[in-house]
Amino acid sequence: MKTVVWQSLSENQQESLLQRPAITEGANITAIVADVVADVRQRGDEALLELTEKFDRVRPDSIRVSEQEVTAATSRLSDNMKQALQQAYQNIATFHKAQKTKPLRVETQPGVVCEQVTRPINSVGLYIPGGSAPLPSTVLMLGVPAQIAGCRQVVLCSPPPIADEILYVAQLCGITEIYNIGGSQAIAAMAYGTKSVARVDKIFGPGNAFVTEAKRQVSNDFRGAAIDMPAGPSEVLVIADKTADPDFIAADLLSQAEHGPDSQVILLTPEPSIADRVADAIQLQLKVLPRADIARQALGSSILIVTETISQCISISNHYGPEHLIVQTREPRELVPLLDNAGSIFLGDWSPESVGDYASGTNHVLPTYGYTRTYSSLGLADFSKRMTVQELTADGLKILAPTVVTMAEAEGLDAHKRAVTIRIEKLQQQEILKAQQVEEKEA
């Protein structure tokens, strides 16, 4: 992991230094995924079973996980694990419940009322990756907001065999539709539906290059499903001053570096001594990490940057837009108003990135690869949709009609204009008739 002095670089060199590792999908992945998606659409469950056997080297007895299997998985877990998962569930639920919005009702002018109401997305699909270790935390991050939002149907897919921890957390989140399928075939099944797997409106969750490509393809097809956000490799950026603990910084950088060879970690500090001590601490801590080889590969594209000031650190961070941003300075809270682009921010010495990954309450599904400029961390709103309502009285329409008529004429949309004027004419006729009735009665 190299150390550089920011001011010693030209603008082009500075820009090049902040380039993320390239995402190498390749035409072959695109073609493979397209074939898988088409196969699942055409042959449904039969294709799912064959593809699962081909890619995961196992043919499940049943595509759907039974209630008995979930109960058995729960019984196999230790009390310690259950308690940890329950605590994480409570914290995540508490934070996401607080994100509920109240209906909005505004009278924009006399007789014109506008409202905004929220409804849950009817059906959602959650993808939980397989791999060497189970990811119950991802089930929590997706399942809890889906549950709180009130999504009527929640489908969960994960490669077989599904870990006990995943099944237990699914139960905590009230998820009963769980399927033994993974990879791009699972994304296709949720996007288009099969005899066993229900079609969903939106798909959430991380995955490898094949899963990411499948999500991209189905989201670009109007017959497919929406997705949560673009995905990329994990990343963390740390802003530190002279009060920061180098051991803490090193641990935080390595916690992201161990995710994968394509992860990127960055330190920004105006203190050369901090950069040097962090570099030493990284080498010491690497010696005891089981995933040290993976972390070393990630460190190859990672950097320790020495700046002139903390203000310069903030400027660089805002330009880079990290997935995770850790602020270890004397007064970290004071920097928050100055930070514009980050997925999730961790303030102070006692807020390691790991707590956000698991149990602080915030969501760990975050935009990466610079998408923090336009995307937000996953939250309750992602499992909901907003509808607007307007209601006008007759007097309200009369007041607003000239504005609408003028604008419709300017845009050459006569039917729009007519939808207003036909009502105004009807009102005028009613008023004339009413006046005549009054005159007749008085006579």
UniProtKB/Swiss-Prot annotation:
Gene3D superfamilies: 1.20.5.1300, Nitrogenase molybdenum iron protein domain
Cofactor(s) of this protein: Zn(2+)
GO biological process, one term: L-histidine biosynthetic process
Residues bound to substrate: S234, Q256, H259, H324, D357, E411, H416
Family annotation (InterPro entries): Ald_DH/histidinol_DH, Histidinol_DH_CS, Histidinol_DH_monofunct, Hstdl_DH
Signal peptide from the UniProt entry: none
EC number: 1.1.1.23
Catalysed reactions listed for this entry: L-histidinol + 2 NAD(+) + H2O = L-histidine + 2 NADH + 3 H(+)
GO cellular-component term (any): cytosol
Keyword annotations: Amino-acid biosynthesis, Histidine biosynthesis, Metal-binding, NAD, Oxidoreductase, Zinc
Active site: E323, H324
Residues where NAD(+) binds: Y127, Q185, N208
Pfam families, sorted: Histidinol_dh (PF00815)
A molecular function GO annotation: NAD binding
Binding site for Zn(2+): Q256, H259, D357, H416
Cofactor details (free text): Binds 1 zinc ion per subunit.
PROSITE patterns (UniProt xref): HISOL_DEHYDROGENASE
Pathway of action: Amino-acid biosynthesis; L-histidine biosynthesis; L-histidine from 5-phospho-alpha-D-ribose 1-diphosphate: step 9/9
Function description: Catalyzes the sequential NAD-dependent oxidations of L-histidinol to L-histidinaldehyde and then to L-histidine.
Protein family (similarity comment): Belongs to the histidinol dehydrogenase family.
Protein's UniProt name: Histidinol dehydrogenase
Lineage of the species this protein comes from: Bacteria, Pseudomonadati, Pseudomonadota, Gammaproteobacteria, Vibrionales
Gene symbol of the encoding locus: hisD
